Amino acid sequence: MSMKPRRGTAAGKALILAALLTIAVPEAAHAKTADVTVVSPGPTMGPPTPFTGVSSHADCPDGLVSGGGADQAIGSDEMSNGNHVMGMVPSADGATEYVDTPGVVGTDAAHWMAFGGSGSRSSDAFSTTPYAICLSSNLIRHTQVVMNKAQGPSTGLSSKLVTATCPTGTVLIGGGARTTPASVGSLKPIASFPTFNDADHHFGAIAAGDGEHDPDAWTAVGGIGGGRGADNMTYAYAICSTDDIDLKHVSTTVRFTEVSGPNTASTGQTATAGCTRGEGRLVSGGAAISGGNVTTTDFGKATSGGPHLNGSFPSDAAGTPAGDGTANPSYWTAATHSGGSPSQGSYSDVWALCLDVRHGHKP
């Protein structure tokens, strides 16, 4: 006759522990993970002459790009007014842009391109450094790039807003912005940010605010100073998961900061936002120079034509750019510049997009 060990005996406790381990180990083996690494090859010098552009790229050898940015060296004299970001976008190969028919334009992009442009002035001090945020996750194994574009801005002191929206059943993990051509010296992207394709956010015209969850779209705003160009284009890019994941395990949180300035001519400003430990990994970020209140009203450009972006990049809490190989940075920084004229009422805006694959906000 066999005897079952009693619950309170050592043998009984051992059997209970063994049973719990049998249940727990498979669960742990299927834990959802997400980690990011910053890749940056360093600066590419230029543009060397007025009304030209320069491109550079960062590549993810062991993951997919979830976002990225750029940082520019501009010098310290009046020539600094001439250098501006022209684009920060995902790429299939580090050399090719997604610029054709809007919609889903690529899958599993692993490269990030950064573009710098010059106005009427150039300097040997100008350079552009790209930053790729490389995502490794056992939940988000594939991504897709959605592109949207619009003609403009084409007349002086105007802007053009365009929004790319993720397909239903996917999650937004990053985005980018681009304007062309570089030969129009005052044309540049002045905003790149996460948003929502819904009425509350005016279908992308109002940016996602601090603490908002699960944005599904990315907006780009092109701005122009005194120049004109009938062929000017503004592009927006959203980097989205594919629809084969269980969204109940995924949540994103937006962190946003807005600071006043730069207001006086030939000056710069920075703003930094970051993900808290409980919000998951920083997977991308955005930046803008604006007329303020971008999370409560439709985006409005700064009053003059000169304000522009000089950077949008992963960083530490003090705004220092993250170095090549940095694992799981927590902060994103926007670097803005007034250009050669005063710009009263300008604001610098920055967004950090935080991804949590352990807990979801959705029922």
Could you describe each region identified by the protein language model?
Residues 2-31:
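Secretory targeting and sorting signals
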Residues 32-363:
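Extracellular attachment/recognition segments
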